[in-house]
Design a protein with these regions (language model features):
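Exposed alpha-helical structural elements
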Residues: 45, 49, 102, 116-119, ...
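Function-dense linear segments that define catalytic or interfacial modules
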Residues: 55-168
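Conserved mixed alpha/beta core segments that line enzyme active sites in large multi-domain catalysts
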Residues: 39, 46-50, 55-56, 62, ...
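Internal maturation/activation junctions in enzymes
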Residues: 1-40, 132-145, 149, 153, ...
Length: 204
């Protein structure tokens, strides 16, 4: 999948997935389309965008706020927020232009305890940290190498959440588990980055 971030004023992108687009333009199914906001729009423009999204029946064009992205990037204190960030197609990873994320997946089983998940997250984080050292890309511009060396983004994803008694609920216990798991990933990454002689991931 790809993501397309367009200007708010781009009417062609606004309606790219309206009507029966899949009959005449089936390749559009491969991209998620969003408007990239660089400032707060006035209410009339904002409502027009929402109305267009509703009428498209496709859930697009979505909304991506670059100002909010900069604030989020600055939260950890490890990441330089002075970029016009984009995002991956699912919208959970902030990316520089020519940026990438080293993804690993944790499979959650229904009976997993917090300790079980900590161990799985640890292994996934170690794998992602090692993967981030593979930064000498051939056949692409050097900026890809530079960004990977500087940021070493990790994505420790979890699948099977809805099968789990604790994590499938919107509860304070689930929130606490997720906070602990993320903190553990950050700690493990810092330890292994030091062992490998590389910088810590700026975001996990």
């Amino acid at each position: 999948a790809l993501i397309s971030l367009s200007n708010l004023s781009d009417d062609r992108m606004r309606v790219a997935k309206s009507g029966k687009w899949w009959e005449s333009e089936p390749q559009r199914a491969l991209a998620n389309n969003s408007a990239a906001y660089t400032e707060r729009p006035d209410m009339e423009i904002f409502l027009k965008e929402w109305q267009s999204l509703i009428e498209s029946k496709s859930g697009e064009r979505g909304i991506f706020n670059r100002v909010a992205a900069k604030k989020k990037a600055a939260e950890s204190g490890r990441r330089n927020p002075d970029f016009d960030f984009g995002t991956n197609p699912c919208g959970e990873i902030l990316l520089r232009s020519a940026g990438l994320c080293n993804l690993t997946e944790v499979v959650i089983r229904a009976g997993d305890t917090l300790k079980d998940l900590m161990e799985k997250v640890e292994v996934a984080t170690i794998m992602g940290t090692f993967q981030s050292t593979l930064s000498k890309f051939r056949y692409v511009r050097s900026i890809w190498h530079k960004n990977q060396e500087e940021e070493r983004l990790l994505g420790v994803s979890m699948t099977g959440i809805m099968d789990h008694e604790v994590l499938s609920k919107a509860s304070s216990e689930a929130a606490n588990w997720l906070t602990e798991l993320r903190a553990h990933a950050v700690k493990v990454n810092a330890e292994w980055a030091a062992k490998l002689g590389i910088n810590q991931s700026v975001a996990i």
